[in-house]
Amino acid sequence: MLNSRHGLDAMPVVDSLLFCSPAREDASRFMLATVGELGLPAIRMRMEETFQGVPMLCVSAQATDAEKLASLRHGFAGPGILVLEDLDLWGAPVIDAADDMVGFFMAAMSRGAREAVNLIRQAVENPDVYVLASASSLEAIDPFFTELLFPLTCVDIDYPTAEERADIWMDIARDHPSIRSVSRDELVRLSANLPRYDIYMAAREAIEEAYKQGLVERRYIPVSRENLFDKLAAYQPLDSAEYAELERLVVSDFSASLGDLNDLVG
């Protein structure tokens, strides 16, 4: 009905979505969560380096989607998702002249690269296909790709708020009981200005250290305050107020433990 009312042959092209965050991992997580919510067959593209340092475009898909994406060389046959990971790490040749140079550029590309560019272009032009990309910022992306993804909507993802950090630490504590003895209020305050990914990584490193220490001593050792604060400090900028406080608390806890040891020896 909308097509006839508006006098269009088909639904307009859906904007490509670019998830941007100073922490590239956070942008990727939000993008992949969106992929999960959509529940459509998805193909992922990302740039990696070979052992020789040569950039290489890697294309992958879930095994369950293989049959639906078998004819992908000819474009999406139905609804789907094209995921472009860390687009700011992709490089493209500089093209000064627009129309006459594009043909020369495409001819010079390898067959695989041409197919990848054509697939992206077909996905952008297909209203049944969602194109999702992640990057640290829009400005960090090569203009070749921003033009290729037009129309493009940028979704800015900032660092987590205090409320979000509280939810993150609650989520970590639910999965890892050994961390529950550390004050959540302190963790929320001292993890300010950290990306979500760094918070999870700091917690995981502290949990793994406590686990290994328990294996050595042959007993259960929960995650200590000193252990977790030390891991958080490793992710905080050296000139931040949070780093200074974490450093002070770690030294204070260490000094207190030495005092307890002296009392036992004495």
Locate predicted features.
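Walker A/P-loop NTP-binding motif of AAA+ ATPase domains
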Residues: M1-D185
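C-terminal engagement/docking regions of AAA+ P-loop ATPases
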Residues: L2-M11, E25-F30, R218-G266
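Residue-level signal for alpha-helical context at structural boundaries
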Residues: E49, L138, S183, E205, ...
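Short coil/turn linker and secondary-structure boundary residues
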Residues: A63, P160, V182, L194, ...
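Residue-level signal for secondary-structure boundary elements
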Residues: D128, P177, S181, I199, ...
